[in-house]
């Protein structure tokens, strides 16, 4: 897990799995043995890799770790211990396992996935072809190379090595998306301490955003505030805070993207709403966050969990929105994903395919006291930028706030806790990438077919041996 941000030692991803394949998995001939050694490997990985969850919910961490372990261990247990199909089976198993992790439990827990560990390595660019699962497949190819080098199977290294080199070269050769316009954009970080809960007074957060914005001098076409940067008691359309933001957008002559904590009329629930405000006409559009954070914005199985956990920080549950994350503005359509949604490539894809020419990501990581979650959120933004061929503007309350180019380069980045406005020229783009056009399903289906073939081949070999 040291390949993951904030450590970012990307070679340890394929090297760690490759060493496990060579010295733990390779001799396991029976399916049960392979399942046991795979489960032991991933249990250790997720006990550490998902430990950040304990700051949000210890019961959630206890529930998630064994489920995540089993999800990754099961596909790897189907990979034969030897034979020519092993080299394809390992990448396929990793792809299939991670694809399932994006769906279950609790609607998916894609944090600490293998692709995040490669954003500082040479395979980041391949996300333009096949998204994060394509990057994960190359981690599997790299692991096979390490395994065969350790076994001194020199000749068997050739085709995996060709794949590991050729795919990134093909990604570099792919034409870029079309630049439609260049604008000056700013992302605002209000600042503050880490490790504060979600009930930090909304007024103080809003005032810190206003102070940072007012202190910034210069012309801005587009400005993005962080998640929960303001609030409303009841419908935000009638709130004083919206009127204040409309006045601010008009005064700065900028399109303003801000996020509201909107309490429902019954005060028992809330909506996480991101709005677009035009300088001339005021409120232009809104998007209500559709993929909610389990144990953060709602409690799965609340009646079961409540006797064993303090749920006072989640006294209100969020109401999920519907539809793609895209906001219509005077600059054109802007794709938006709120906070945790940036980890889900399909959500960003939906917003971009609905017309988004740039991606805005208001986020909030102040509930966590370390840099693990902020750095993984930034890594996710880098992956989403490459996949979509779009600039990504990530605005976090306490960091990291960043501007990311379509090749995954972080052109501007804040430090944690500081109050700052980051500004620069960005491009509004159109056009498709292969990852946008195809989505994740072709690679998932291919991985499933390869694993099914591995199982079938192993069964035939066993039948011949017994006969």
Go through the PLM ranges and name each one.
Residues 174-441:
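Soluble catalytic domains of enzymes that build or remodel membrane lipids, polysaccharides, and related
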Residues 464-467:
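Cytoplasmic C-terminal tails of single-pass
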Residues 1-173, 370, 381-384, 396-401, ...:
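Membrane-embedded alpha-helical bundles of multi-pass enzymes
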């Amino acid at each position: 897990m040291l390949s993951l941000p904030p450590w970012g030692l990307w070679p340890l991803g394929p090297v760690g799995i490759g060493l496990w394949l060579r010295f733990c998995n390779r001799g396991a001939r029976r399916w049960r043995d392979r399942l046991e050694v795979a489960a032991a490997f991933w249990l250790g990985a997720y006990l550490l890799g998902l430990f950040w969850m304990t700051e949000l919910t210890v019961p959630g961490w206890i529930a998630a770790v064994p489920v995540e372990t089993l999800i990754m261990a099961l596909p790897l247990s189907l990979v034969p211990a030897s034979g020519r199909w092993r080299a394809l089976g390992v990448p396929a198993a990793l792809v299939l396992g991670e694809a399932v992790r994006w769906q279950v439990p609790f609607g998916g827990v894609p944090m600490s996935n293998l692709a995040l560990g490669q954003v500082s390595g040479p395979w980041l660019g391949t996300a333009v072809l096949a998204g994060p699962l394509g990057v994960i497949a190359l981690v599997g190819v790299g692991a096979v190379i390490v395994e065969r080098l350790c076994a001194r199977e020199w000749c068997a290294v050739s085709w995996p090595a060709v794949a590991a080199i050729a795919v990134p070269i093909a990604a570099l050769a792919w034409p870029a998306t079309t630049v439609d316009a260049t604008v000056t954009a700013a992302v605002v970080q209000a600042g503050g301490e880490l490790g504060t809960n979600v009930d930090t007074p909304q007024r103080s957060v809003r005032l810190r955003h206003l102070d940072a914005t007012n202190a910034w001098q210069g012309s801005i076409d587009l400005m993005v505030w962080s998640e929960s940067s303001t609030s409303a008691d009841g419908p935000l359309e009638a709130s004083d805070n919206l009127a204040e933001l409309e006045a601010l957008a008009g005064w700065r002559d900028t399109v303003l993207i801000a996020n509201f904590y909107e309490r429902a009329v019954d005060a028992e629930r809330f909506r996480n709403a991101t709005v677009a405000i035009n300088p001339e006409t005021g409120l232009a559009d809104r998007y209500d966050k559709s993929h909610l954070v389990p144990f953060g914005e709602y409690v799965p199985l609340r009646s079961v969990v409540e006797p064993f956990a303090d749920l006072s920080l989640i006294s209100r549950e969020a109401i999920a929105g519907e539809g793609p994350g895209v906001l219509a503005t005077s600059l054109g359509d802007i794709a938006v994903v709120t906070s945790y949604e940036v980890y889900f490539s399909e959500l960003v894809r939906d917003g971009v395919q609905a017309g988004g020419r740039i991606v805005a990501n208001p986020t909030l990581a102040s509930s966590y006291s370390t840099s693990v979650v902020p750095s993984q959120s930034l890594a996710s933004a880098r992956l989403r930028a490459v996949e979509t061929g779009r600039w990504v503007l990530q605005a976090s309350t306490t960091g990291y706030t960043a501007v990311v180019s379509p090749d995954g380069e972080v052109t501007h980045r804040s430090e944690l806790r500081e109050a700052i406005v980051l500004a620069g020229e960005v491009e509004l783009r159109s056009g498709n990438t292969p990852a946008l056009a195809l989505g994740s399903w072709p690679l998932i289906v291919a991985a499933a077919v390869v694993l099914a073939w591995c199982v079938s081949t192993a069964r035939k070999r066993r039948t011949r041996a017994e006969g």
